[in-house]
Amino acid sequence: MALEIDAKNAAATGDAGTIGKAKAKENKNHNNNNNAPAAGEKNLVNGSSAATKKKGKKNRNKSPPQNAVEAEASAALSNGHSENGDAADANANVLAEKGEGVAAGAVVGDGAEGGASAEGAVAEGDAAAAGEDVDLDALHDIGITVNISSPGTDVLSVQLSSMELVQEIHQLLMDREETCHRTCFSLQLDNVTLDNFAELKTIESLEQGSTIRVVEEPYTMREARIHVRHVRDLLKNLDPADAYNGIDCTSLTYLNTITQGDLLDKKRTRPDSVDCTPPDYVTPGVREPPLLPLHPNIKNAKGPQALKVLTTSAWNPPPGPRKLHGDLMYLYVVTMEDKRFHISACSKGFYINQSTDECFNPKPDNPSHLSHSLIDLLSHISPSFRRAFQAIQKRRTMRHAFERVATPYQVYQWAAPQLEHTVDAIRAEDAFSSKLGYEEHIPGQTRDWNEELQTTRELPRKTLPERLLRERAIFKVHGDFVTAATRGAMAVIDGNVLAINPGEDAKMQMFIWNNIFFSLGFDVRDHYKELGGDHAAFVAPRYDLHGVRVYNAVDIEGLYTLGTVVIDYRGYRVTAQSIIPGILEREQEQSVVYGSIDFGKTVLSHPKYLELLRQAGKHLKILPHSVLNERDEPVELCSSVECKGIIGNDGRHYILDLLRTFPPDVNFLKLQDVQLSKELTEMGFPIEHRHKLCCLRQELLEAFIEDRYVTFIRIAAVHLQQLNAKKQAATANAEKELPAIAEKQEEPNEEQPEKTEEQPAEKEESKPTPSETKSAEAMVNAIREAQSNVAVSNEVQAAEVVKRACAAVGSLKEKEFDFRFNPDVFSPGIRHVDGPDGGVQSLAKQKRLVQDAAEFLVLKQIPAFIKEHMAHSSPPIDGQSLTESLHSHGINVRYLGKVIKMLGQMPRMDYLHRIAILEIIVRATKHIYYTYMQSTEPLHLSAAISHFLNCLLTTGPVNPAVSSDELHKKQPRNNSGKHNKHKAAKASKPQAAAAQNGNATAAGSGGAGATTSGATSSNSDWTLVTPRSLWQQIRKEVKAYWNWELDCDSIESAGAKYGLLRISLLRAFCLKVGIQVLLREYNFESKHKPTFGDDDIVNVFPVVKHISPRATDAYNFYTTGQAKIQQGMLKEGYELISEALNLLNNVFGAMHQENDSCLRMLARLSYLLGDAQDALAIQQRAVIMSERVNGIDHPSTILEYTHLSLYSFANGHVGMSLKLLYRARYLLVLICGEDHPEVALIDSNISLILHALGEYELSLRFIEHALKLNLKYFGNKAMHVAVSYHLMARIQSCMGDFRSALNNEKETYSIYKSQLGEKHEKTRESAECLRLLTHEAVALQRKMNDIYSNGKLTSDLPPIHITPPSMGSVLEMLNTINGILFVHISQKDIVKVRSEIEKHLKTNTDENDVPDESEITSALKTIVAAVNNNDNASETEQPKDEASAAGTPTQLTNGSEESTATVSS
């Protein structure tokens, strides 16, 4: 809050340095939202030993001096919330250097190559900046060392960046252990007070080694409150209560608990000193994993208690006479010694006064002790406080920096322990002291969200620093808006906000809170009557959000969308939207200048909207089309009819109601004039869905157009070859040119599958590629060039070829490849203007195209999705990862039933089949739960939820316990009077225009009137639900929604038939609907009492859907880095991805999912480059970040843990490596059970390490389980299976069981021989292993025969000498299993290969042509691939790591996530 005022004042005066920077000073609790770590939080990281700052190599991006426009824009935006502090980049500072001149995270090294590639990255990925010379040097600043002198502490020497603000030194001091208790001070240099918002480089007298003094300043009321709040935060710092309660963007991480400290500080462990026994719940064969280990060591998490009570006194506020004596406020404290004190805060500091609970005496106590810091005063009066505070501070500073930074969005926990509810005046004040909390204290008014959101998008974006500033501002304001919208939606449903139309039915009520408009997901005024009623109204906000996302991604200047957040809470769906200026002052009909407010009966158009939407439509593949209005006049539209254009009072052109941005899905619409293909009809399509808003996904349209484009090129090439075969003179040219054209067009599809399939959303964010129209023209030109030596008639023939190809693929234009879609083509009630047959405006052609796209989804995309997952390279782990994978292929979740049918016929896809069934059950149950919750009184919520969970997850007794007095009929609350009815109805009218879309959002306000008399009769309906009735409803819902037959009628039959775990179903359901259950072990088999009771429901939390702003330049660097890695240039890739991380830090701050992906990639690259210690340091941060931003049991977190265990082992932390694998295995089994390909990978890793430690029996159990899974999912002849057999043979030979070992090694040899051939290195190694095992087995048998022949044991029988494997060989095998292979190539080999290539190239090129480096490197890669006989790198054992690191390694990795093929010479 403090900072918001500073920022506002700064903005008003136009102070260039201050705009938006004020956020840095703010304590997290004073902020409406804490998503992006502020500058102070960055310094919090810098101050930590974990994040040592590299000299001057921090990527600090500042805007150039702001001109008047920017100053005005920044003033408008968010009162100081526009930026997330200047680069909260804990990450950028700690990337270890890779080779000389490669800075931490800097692309620009000593050589120019890095910089060139970086510029290329931006140029390649950003069409708008194609001509821009990106000066990365300008983004890197120089370091400066200063001394800071504070009262009562030693002089502190700190390294700072010249681009940091003075404010950031404040935050640094407030975070350091020695000075953290100071909040009210100024910084002086040579007795001159420094401006908080000045950059250090602008201070003339500041030099290397200057001393800055900390000077205590007098308190004001505001500063005193900030100080008390800061003290409370310091005392509560270790308490995880806020993370469990989902407050202030705090979240949990348990890596430190599992590793018992920082991994980097640990020494290597000797194998014989490691405790490696796995917990029972980690060993193979566990039925239901326990719940308690999910949150380890929660008893010791809180830390020591320093005070019993710290609260504001009831004697507040100071009376007039005391104000004149300087009293600001009074505090009440109870120490651990049980002493009670009343404390006065005055301008000089804090002192004990003589007041008691009954008597007010504000005079200082005797002897008086005045302290500028409250901590000093409390330490003086309480020895217990002093000891506890020191312990808290010690533990706080020991925590990793990433554990203390706020996350961008709130992460909620689905299980929480019983938390002690303590006295906390500040928490109470936040809840009740004002309607809105701290926003209200901003001078003037509450925040104007719409103005902030739109102003940030208007910021300049021509240069890289400008784009970074703009994206940072967009991200910060968006994050604040999401937090405010979530808070408002919860307040609406809890009944704490007055409706703007209180006289209407609860379902029809709308709300405005904090300048945000809220509406509920019900069909008010029969708006969606024809489209599916409440069902349509419920899904419309989600489709609208998709529309907002894609229009924001296209980012057309001058076209504006509303800030939109969709929140599901307590069974209701709420849409939160920013408010268009002036919309509340006009009737809806006056507001809309484009589109239709009545689904096409009346239609308007507007030239400016046509211009803007036509630009957007090029990227979104939307076809401009004409419809007839009520006067039968044609009206041109460049969007769907429902899309409305409103010009606000601010002159901006807004579009809203974007629910039909994409074409309809005809497979789920029963239309009279549409005949689906035979294949689709046989599959049961069309299926009549419960609403008519089903549309195709953008990812599908992109894949469809790409598929058609490839077909188009092939057809054109074939026709041209036939044409040119007749022309003898042109034959040679034709054969060279045309296949080249076809290949050229096909290459992008093959080279960039990640872009099209895994990251479709990112595609939108990067600058659009040229349209297919231009591509087609380019191809035609190329064809003409190829035919230039032929007669003019051939040009006509070439054009005919293109025409035929266009006709074959169904292009809208006859002579050009053109694929765009009319979103209104099947909309009921809309009258289209039909163009001539064969033309772009031909309605039949448009309909055919939409039908073809829907058919492509079923016949090509779903099989492609299944085929892709057959390799199990990155298998989905839970419903969320399955959904993301479906969406990346453009497959809607409504096709899940079809996907399950296809998976059910494939035993090798059993795990995915089971995950899909769990997801379909959870989603069906969610639909039922929402209806169930809407008819439940707030009084009975915990009883109703626990009863529902009992019915879902148990078959025991489920009698709901509701006390009789609670069942008495409640009197309806008197809704603010009938005389307001007319006024309220009038107010609601214009607002319907403000959020047409809002009509479609979540469902009803629980406290705001949903439980009034109309609902009372059904308030106890929830008590009638039984397990049998609930599962019958689930079956009906699955059949109705997904057209799939669920063959079970209870949780027991579901478990028996489909292998579902109850704990997995509980987790998935709680996360889906927002329930937090008590962390304890649940007995689901109980026959005597219900499994869940009222007290087991700890909380309900909102499930929030919103748009995630992207960092486009960072994305371009990242994708260019990935391309470099694919080409084998690991160092260049590392540098580019480091730079991407720096840019992400600038935009998002230190904590974000995308930062996590960069860290994981950098750790893997460090490991491949031979720096295992650096890999460990980076991966440790990746694990903490994933736990914090994704969740402690998120699939990404499991992946991070497995990577960290490998790097831990490589660094000699053997025991720690096992603990990390045990954690990963536990989480994986909790989420999806033991029957999963990833479990096989983890079990193989565990087995190997246990084998190295001599725990052979345990090791054998894990490898047997891994082998069983590998056989099931990869087949008998797979390389995974060969490796498992080989590992088992190694373990059994160490146990002396040579016969079994021999049998298993024979299996390995058999697989290698059949897959790789007899001469392959792996086959030869296996044959040698067989020979040794045979020798050992024969020797043992001889000894046994001697014993039998002598009839007794001979005392001198030599023991079997079992040599455990060396750590080096175990690491090699671990690398192999985890997809990393080092192939050693000697320098001599490389020289030989190089000369061969040069010879070969010379024969094929002119004498003057010299092959460039990339050609030779490419050829080298080909040869390396040939040497390995196309062997899958992840399934072969590697030679000595040490040798490869010393020579010139070729690294081939094909892990679960990144595949790398590299040659470095």
From Swiss-Prot:
- Main location (coarse class): cytoplasm
**Composition bias, kind Low complexity: at what positions?**
30-51, 987-1003, 1010-1020
* All residue ranges annotated as the Clu domain in the record: 427-669
Domain of life, per lineage: Eukaryota
Q: Give the molecular function GO annotations.
A: mRNA binding; ribosome binding
Q: Which CDD domains does the UniProt record give?
A: CLU-central
SUPFAM superfamilies named among the record's database cross-references: Hypothetical protein c14orf129, hspc210, TPR-like
Q: List every position bearing Phosphoserine.
A: S273
User: What biological-process GO terms show up in the record?
Assistant: asymmetric neuroblast division; intracellular distribution of mitochondria; mitochondrion organization; ribosome localization
What GO cellular component term, any one, is given?
A: cytosol
Q: Which Gene3D superfamilies match?
A: Hypothetical protein (hspc210), Tetratricopeptide repeat domain
Q: Which portions of the sequence form the region Disordered?
A: 1-87, 742-776, 962-1021, 1428-1465
Q: Which UniProt keywords apply?
A: Cytoplasm, Phosphoprotein, Repeat, TPR repeat
What PANTHER family does the record tag this protein with? Answer: CLUSTERED MITOCHONDRIA PROTEIN HOMOLOG, EUKARYOTIC TRANSLATION INITIATION FACTOR 3 SUBUNIT EIF-3
Concerning its family, UniProt says: Belongs to the CLU family.
**What name appears for this protein in its UniProt entry?**
Protein clueless
Q: Name its species.
A: Drosophila virilis (Fruit fly)
